């Protein structure tokens, strides 16, 4: 079943298999390009030639019947790549129209060289007039975006923005060189007009802005080409400065390739306890329990309100249920502390509410986790809202008044969506989304553990190790109620089994969650609209028991 899912980042050779699982800063790459070129005994013009040729090959293979290519070139090296593409397209018999943005200073040396080579084969270009409407040949059937590269920060200037908006409105396929113009290569922010590409060809390394933030709306299918620099990029000194990992479909085999011992028993597979389901929110605890059981926890126990005990046991008889009746703060905390002694993993949040029940659960969980640092504590939903109250002294927080002391919990996992993240950081949602990687680092520091920042291009960051990952799985169908409850159950169940450290457990849980949603969307061409959270649960065993390449066959390069 996993083999039916399409890879989100295509590669040309097996040597690129490792590199598409790592991400470097675009700024680092710009500084490193001279050394990269020198390693191949070529100059930067030679490297541009490789990039343009690689992009041409990608686009020509995708669009074999398109006869008239429009190449839009800007004033930087992205435009230089466009000239190289134009030359190869012309040599292949395509009709090529090159439109150049006006610029007041000379082209960079490499771009000027590519422009000269284009003109040397008889190529021509037109310069767009400032303020004039964009005039395009009527028979153009492919638009190549070479306007702006990875150095853009902030919205494009108005003339660029006008062109971008115009081509986005045309019923013609659009492809982007390295990154869609207008998209921030470091953060994935589209601060203004941004090219909506059907395909993007990127070079040498993946950049974070292609994978998170608003990238999913603009990048289309991603194609990675290393330009023959695989050995140079995988050297330890380069791997050490990689910004983060890209966790993707084939990582399923790395996380779950080791089979469960034939001598396993329910005690050895971990005991997870889930706290949630206050009055009116029983479904959340139920979905979380089902996910925890299905991902392989040895024993699952749920603390919830009495009215949900029977429905939960009917739906998920494998789970144990403890009904919590009291609303007295100290009695609540004591009951929960006693229950927590049984568990190896705690998860607090699904349907928790922010009343006395929720406040007691969070207080007890933090106290217990501080005393039992070996246990994993997962916090989600209203547990995070209550935690924000502790941090910022808001009404409804587990501590009234000033900020409460919070323990350092290296084995904690918090799983905020952008709204919860904004409350935890006391900022706007827009501030979180502007730089999701930076937000995840700040969030992980709150308890000194691991943060999973939900959203397209989920970010996982571990405070103690400073490791970061972008999880490239999942789809828009996950924008529905209950998805976070399922994720909490998956994380609790995986943490209970202690297959990996907390960071890798979090990455694995996010990956299972996203891949399950992709499986649902792919079945019989169903699509993403109307996916229910419970549908993901039934796909989980297929993922965590998937057979594929052994982890030993996918060894990471030294330096990681």
Curated annotation (Swiss-Prot):
Keyword Mitochondrion on this protein? Answer: no
EC identifiers of the protein: 4.2.1.136, 5.1.99.6
Annotated ADP binding sites: 454-458, 475-484
Domain (YjeF C-terminal): residue spans on this chain:
249-547
Ranges for region ADP-dependent (S)-NAD(P)H-hydrate dehydratase: 249-560
| Co-factor remark | Binds 1 potassium ion per subunit.
According to the record, the residues making up region (NADPHX 1) are: 77-81, 149-155
What InterPro entries does the database record attribute to this sequence?
A: Carbohydrate_kinase_pred_CS, CARKD, Nnr, Ribokinase-like, YjeF_N_dom, YjeF_N_dom_sf
Swiss-Prot/TrEMBL catalytic activity: (6S)-NADHX + ADP = AMP + phosphate + NADH + H(+); (6S)-NADPHX + ADP = AMP + phosphate + NADPH + H(+); (6R)-NADHX = (6S)-NADHX; (6R)-NADPHX = (6S)-NADPHX
Superkingdom of the source species: Eukaryota
One GO MF term on file is: ATP binding
Give binding positions for (6S)-NADPHX 2. 351, 485
User: Where are the annotated segments for NADPHX 2?
Assistant: 417-423
Q: What Pfam families does the annotation carry?
A: Carb_kinase (PF01256), YjeF_N (PF03853)
Q: Which residues bind K(+)?
A: 78, 145, 181
Q: Where does (6S)-NADPHX 1 bind?
A: 160, 178
Q: Which UniProt keywords apply?
A: ATP-binding, Isomerase, Lyase, Metal-binding, Multifunctional enzyme, NAD, NADP, Nucleotide-binding, Potassium
Question: What cofactor is this protein dependent on?
Answer: K(+)
Region annotated NAD(P)H-hydrate epimerase sits at 1-241
GO biological process: one example: metabolite repair
Q: Which residues form the YjeF N-terminal domain?
A: 29-235
PANTHER family on file: ATP-DEPENDENT (S)-NAD(P)H-HYDRATE DEHYDRATASE, ATP-DEPENDENT (S)-NAD(P)H-HYDRATE DEHYDRATASE FAMILY MEMBER
Q: What is the stated purpose of this protein? A: Bifunctional enzyme that catalyzes the epimerization of the S- and R-forms of NAD(P)HX and the dehydration of the S-form of NAD(P)HX at the expense of ADP, which is converted to AMP. This allows the repair of both epimers of NAD(P)HX, a damaged form of NAD(P)H that is a result of enzymatic or heat-dependent hydration.
This chain belongs to the protein called Bifunctional NAD(P)H-hydrate repair enzyme
Organism, as annotated: Leishmania major
Lineage of origin = Eukaryota, Discoba, Euglenozoa, Kinetoplastea, Metakinetoplastina
């Amino acid at each position: 079943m996993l083999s039916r899912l399409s890879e989100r980042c295509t590669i040309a050779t097996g040597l690129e298999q490792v590199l598409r699982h790592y991400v470097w800063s675009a700024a680092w790459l710009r500084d490193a390009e001279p050394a990269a070129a020198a390693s191949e005994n070529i100059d930067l013009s030679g490297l541009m030639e490789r990039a343009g040729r690689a992009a041409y090959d990608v686009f020509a293979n995708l669009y074999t019947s398109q006869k008239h290519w429009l190449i839009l070139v800007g004033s930087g090296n992205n435009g230089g790549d466009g000239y190289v593409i134009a030359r190869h397209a012309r040599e292949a018999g395509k009709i090529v129209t090159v439109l150049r943005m006006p610029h007041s200073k000379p082209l960079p040396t490499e771009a000027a060289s590519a422009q000269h080579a284009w003109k040397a084969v008889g190529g021509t270009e037109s310069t767009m007039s400032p303020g004039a409407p964009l005039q395009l040949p009527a028979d153009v059937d492919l638009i190549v975006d070479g306007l702006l590269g990875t150095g853009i920060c902030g919205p494009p200037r108005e003339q660029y923005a006008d062109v971008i908006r115009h081509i986005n409105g045309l019923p013609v396929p659009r492809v982007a060189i390295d990154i869609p113009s207008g998209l921030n290569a470091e953060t994935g922010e589209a601060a203004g007009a941004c090219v909506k590409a059907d395909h993007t060809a990127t070079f040498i390394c993946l950049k974070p802005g292609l994978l998170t933030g608003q990238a999913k709306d603009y990048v289309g299918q991603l194609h990675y080409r290393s330009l023959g620099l695989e050995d140079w990029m995988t050297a330890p000194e380069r791997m050490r400065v990689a910004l983060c990992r890209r966790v993707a479909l084939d990582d399923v085999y790395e996380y779950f390739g080791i089979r469960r011992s034939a001598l396993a028993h329910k005690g050895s597979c971990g005991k997870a306890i889930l706290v949630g389901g206050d009055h009116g929110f029983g479904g959340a605890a139920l979905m979380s329990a089902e996910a925890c059981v299905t991902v392989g926890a040895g024993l699952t126990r749920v603390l919830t309100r009495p009215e949900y005990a029977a429905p939960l046991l009917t739906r998920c008889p494998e789970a144990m249920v403890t009904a919590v009746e009291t609303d007295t703060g100290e009695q609540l905390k004591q009951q929960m502390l006693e229950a927590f002694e049984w568990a190896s993993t705690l998860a607090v949040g699904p349907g928790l509410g922010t009343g006395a029940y929720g406040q007691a659960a969070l207080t007890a969980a933090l106290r217990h986790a501080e005393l039992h640092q070996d246990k994993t504590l997962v916090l989600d939903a209203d547990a995070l809202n209550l935690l924000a109250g502790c941090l910022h002294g808001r009404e409804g927080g587990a501590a009234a008044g000033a900020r409460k002391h919070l323990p350092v919990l290296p084995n904690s996992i918090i799983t905020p969506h952008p709204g919860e993240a904004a409350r935890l950081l006391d900022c706007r949602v827009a501030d979180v989304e502007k730089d999701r990687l930076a937000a995840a680092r700040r969030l992980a520091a709150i308890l000194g553990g691991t943060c999973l920042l939900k959203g397209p291009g989920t970010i996982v960051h571990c405070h103690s190790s400073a490791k970061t990952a972008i999880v490239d799985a999942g789809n828009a169908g996950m924008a529905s109620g209950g998805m976070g409850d399922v994720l909490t159950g998956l994380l609790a169940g995986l943490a209970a089994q202690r297959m990996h450290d907390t960071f890798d457990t979090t990455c694995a849980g996010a990956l299972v969650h996203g891949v399950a949603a992709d499986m649902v969307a792919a079945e019989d061409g169903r699509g993403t609209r109307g996916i229910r959270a419970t549908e993901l649960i039934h796909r989980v065993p297929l993922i965590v028991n998937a057979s594929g390449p052994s982890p030993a066959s996918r060894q990471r390069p030294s330096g990681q």
